[in-house]
């Protein structure tokens, strides 16, 4: 079974692979990366940032454009999406991966915000998810739209939170679906860990 955003998915949206070395101290040339200044301005001595620092970093960078800056819960989701070592932080390489994904999702959001209201409606969300390779039944899309909308509209921050959660849960599911059949068996603890860490 091909998963959205992964090689062989057809219609996947995420650029590149999901691999990436964990962050850490800078390496030669890293300080020349234009993103490093944003990252280094909030990172501690360990070269890692947590959700609070990520929120400050993304706000300073202006990646949200004219949209409201990301709230802390969305930043927690972003960290958890790339937190492969379960440290609650991300290094510079993970930050760069996040930056690329966020830029792609922002462009995607803009392309589906046809009336330029700064929001997407549930029908636009369904089209967006379909073009990202998610094949979800209408009831699932309806549940997602209800979870992330306010008065029937989904803001940029909520759209990003939705994309982050879908990617993280899909990645978690894919790791457990070794036969790629679209079905897995979870122990209760494994299931709780999967959904509570996203």
Curated annotation (Swiss-Prot):
Positions bound to Ca(2+) 1: 83, 85, 87, 89, 94
SUPFAM superfamilies referenced in this protein's UniProt entry, alphabetically: EF-hand (SSF47473)
Gene3D superfamilies: 6.10.140.900, EF-hand
Molecular function as annotated in GO: calcium ion binding
Description of post-translational modifications: Phosphorylated; partially.
The EF-hand domain, residue ranges: 29-64, 70-103, 100-135, 134-169
Pfam families, sorted: EF-hand_6, EF-hand_8
Quaternary structure (record): Homodimer. Interacts with GCA and RYR2. Interacts with ANXA7.
Note: This protein is encoded by an amplified gene in multidrug-resistant cells. This protein has been shown to bind calcium with high affinity.
Name of this protein: Sorcin
């Amino acid at each position: 079974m091909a998963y959205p955003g992964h090689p062989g998915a057809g219609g996947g949206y995420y650029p590149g692979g999901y691999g990436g070395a964990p962050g850490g101290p800078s390496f030669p040339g890293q300080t020349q990366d234009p993103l490093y200044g944003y990252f280094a301005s909030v990172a501690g001595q360990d070269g890692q940032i947590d959700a609070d620092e990520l929120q400050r970093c993304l706000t300073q960078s202006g990646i949200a454009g004219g949209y409201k800056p990301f709230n802390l819960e969305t930043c927690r989701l972003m960290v958890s999406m790339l937190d492969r070592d379960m440290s609650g932080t991300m290094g510079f390489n993970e930050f760069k991966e996040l930056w690329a994904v966020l830029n792609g999702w922002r462009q995607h959001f803009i392309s589906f915000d046809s009336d330029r209201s700064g929001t997407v409606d549930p029908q636009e969300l369904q089209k967006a998810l379909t073009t990202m390779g998610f094949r979800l039944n209408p009831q699932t899309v309806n549940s997602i739209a209800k979870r992330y909308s306010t008065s029937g509209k989904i803001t940029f921050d909520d759209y990003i939170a939705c994309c982050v959660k879908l990617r993280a849960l899909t990645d978690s599911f894919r790791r457990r679906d070794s036969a790629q059949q679209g079905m897995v068996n979870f122990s209760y603890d494994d299931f709780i860990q999967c959904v509570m860490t996203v």
